[in-house]
A protein has these predicted regions:
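Rossmann-fold cofactor-recognition segment
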Residues: 39-53
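Conserved mid-core segment of classical short-chain dehydrogenase/reductases
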Residues: 78-93, 134
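Active-site helix of classical SDR
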Residues: 107, 141
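Residue(s) in the substrate-gating loop at a strand-loop-helix junction
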Residues: 125
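C-terminal helical subdomain
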Residues: 163-166, 171, 179-231
Length: 231
């Protein structure tokens, strides 16, 4: 299993659950977690996924031969939290590149370089389907990811290709959201309330649900919520 964005949050939880279930896991990103560097079935490839040149040079090919290979495009950033016109070119470019472009480029490599049975997943978001004030770049990037998954699923009906909505998860990104101002993000009070009431989903719950979906053989929607597949 290849997972991007494994240093914390959902990606780290997916890696831990996959290792527990016996998968070989290769993480891709800037910071290697000890979980992968110290585990016999773990490995890590250093690559800044917001760097187009580094991403273009990256190869997913491996000498190992697997019965099945799964790519989970999980790396992402909240991006600029402010009215759209106040976001800088650099902020917008970084958000779109990391959240959408890198996932598309990695998926293209995955589909062409990896042989055998394949499954492809993207960490999506409810923000792909609802306009949230202050999150213009994030909403747009996640909408792009959802549509890309839908198109690839049509182009490759023989493969399992999905984007999953994890819901509001207790991750560093949520802490970043709570640290914003009401001026930049009018909905911040709701996210603070969700955290203080203990309503956030644990990353481990999302990971368990996703691995359950990966192991299923029946058809499921291309875009799905992990909360519908809890174990």
């Amino acid at each position: 299993m290849i997972i991007t964005g494994v240093s914390s949050g959902i990606g780290l939880a997916i890696a831990a659950e996959a290792l527990r279930l016996g998968w070989y896991v290769d993480g891709i990103g800037r910071n290697a977690p000890r979980l992968l560097t110290e585990h016999a079935r773990g490995s890590f490839t250093t690559c800044d996924l917001s760097d187009r040149a580094a991403l273009k040079a990256l190869s997913l090919a491996t000498e190992r031969v697997y019965d099945s290979t799964v790519l989970v495009n999980n790396a992402g950033t909240l991006g600029p939290v402010k009215p759209g016109q106040n976001a800088s070119w650099e902020e917008i470019d970084h958000c779109i590149t990391l959240n959408a472009s890198s996932a598309m480029m990695l998926s293209a490599k995955f589909l062409t370089e990896i042989q055998g049975e394949k499954q492809l997943y993207f960490t999506g978001s409810g923000a792909a389907e609802f306009a949230i004030e202050g999150w213009s770049a994030y909403c747009a990037s996640k909408a792009a990811v959802h549509m890309y998954a839908l198109v690839l699923a049509k182009e490759h009906p023989e493969l399992r290709i999905h984007a999953f909505r994890p819901g509001k998860v207790n991750t560093p990104m949520q802490a970043e959201i709570r640290a914003t101002t009401e001026e930049d993000f009018p909905g911040v009070a709701h996210f603070i309330e969700e955290f203080e009431s203990g309503s956030l989903v644990l990353p481990e719950v999302v990971a368990t649900s996703l691995l359950h979906v990966i192991d299923r053989k029946d058809e499921i929607p291309v875009i799905f919520s992990t909360s519908n597949y809890t174990v």
